[in-house]
From Swiss-Prot:
Pfam families: HAT_KAT11 (PF08214). Residues 1-359 form the Rtt109-type HAT domain. SMART domains: KAT11 (SM01250). The lineage of its organism: Eukaryota, Fungi, Dikarya, Ascomycota, Saccharomycotina. The gene is RTT109. It is found in: Nucleus. Its main location: nucleus. Its EC number is 2.3.1.48. Acetyl-CoA binds at F176, A180, N195, L196, L197, W205. This is Histone acetyltransferase RTT109. It is an enzyme of class 2 (transferase). Belongs to the RTT109 family. It comes from Candida albicans (strain SC5314 / ATCC MYA-2876) (Yeast). Disruption phenotype: Leads to a decreased pathogenicity in mice and increased susceptibility to killing by macrophages in vitro. GO terms for biological process: DNA damage response; filamentous growth; filamentous growth of a population of unicellular organisms; negative regulation of filamentous growth of a population of unicellular organisms; phenotypic switching; regulation of DNA-templated transcription; regulation of phenotypic switching.
Amino acid sequence: MLPPDILQNGEFETIYFQTNPTYIKSPIHIPKSTIGKPDTVKIRHFFALLHQDLVVLGLEVFVYLQIYSDFVEKYVYVSKCDTVGLEKSTIKIGKVIGPVLQYIINYNGYKIKMKNLDEKSKDLSDPSTLVRLQRLRDKLPDIYPNLPYYNDIPPKEECIEYRTLPKTQNLRLCVFTKPAKEYLFPNSAKNPYKNLLNGQSLLRWWISIIDSITKGWNNHKLMIPGADKYATRKFIEKYSDWSEGHIFKKDGLAVQAIPLFPDDPKGRFLELVIVECRYGKMTVSRFYQELAYRQEFLLGDCVSLIGCCKENLEVTYHDDSVSTVTISEYKEFMNSLKSVDFSDRVEVSNFVSNYRKSK
């Protein structure tokens, strides 16, 4: 994921894992009448950089795969990125975040199980002798399972089938930039070496990273709701293939074009539109016009939406030995992380030590 020179030949370490792919509802509303509705899976990624038992930075990314019959729509949403600042870093944060994010974007080693069928329906549809004997054995008195004869029936082995995904992908990278003192690490704002950026500096930082890892992509879009196009262009004028706007469908209803991501201002506003029963008339253009008047875009500092896309990408799926965890294990880790006081060196060091012992 990171070359040795960035890790300074072992001086820095990393934590990285992802969750097993899990079926969820589509982040974009798809009408029930749609023929060939896709299945959607979600994968959570977490990365942290360590230095001498201290956390330096962290990155959380959510990947959504919408699986159609002949292509996959892949959304990569940057959920949170944060630094700790307990010590002065000898490594540039952007030099780490760029390659890690690019790795997550390009990763195609997911093992996605076939959707589970009802176990009862599977048994009823299988009239084999083995299945009938197993049913009969279950009805026998408790004494009979202890007899050798009745235990000769081999246990039924679980057969896991994995999906074969279409080789064509459409990539969508989405980043929401908003200045904050802390995104991942509680109390880290107290630390002397944490570099807190204002909205404009944060936006420029993200654009430089994203531009470096998306060379050759079809579209690079920037939207600053509430800002005029001239103010927006100042941030992207030195990048030849960037323009003002967004990467989602321009026409139609917003609810059928704009995805709902966690802790995303677009998603929060879209949920409000749904609650107010305005989704049947809210077009995409009207949605973005009203979005500019939301409170989080009117607080004075620069808040932006970045989107990049690449169409009809031919990919090769591969097996990989990446560390995976269950959803419950992931949530347990994140809850543990959020309980740490990241202004306390001892507490942070103990957190890292406990994590290593658990592996």
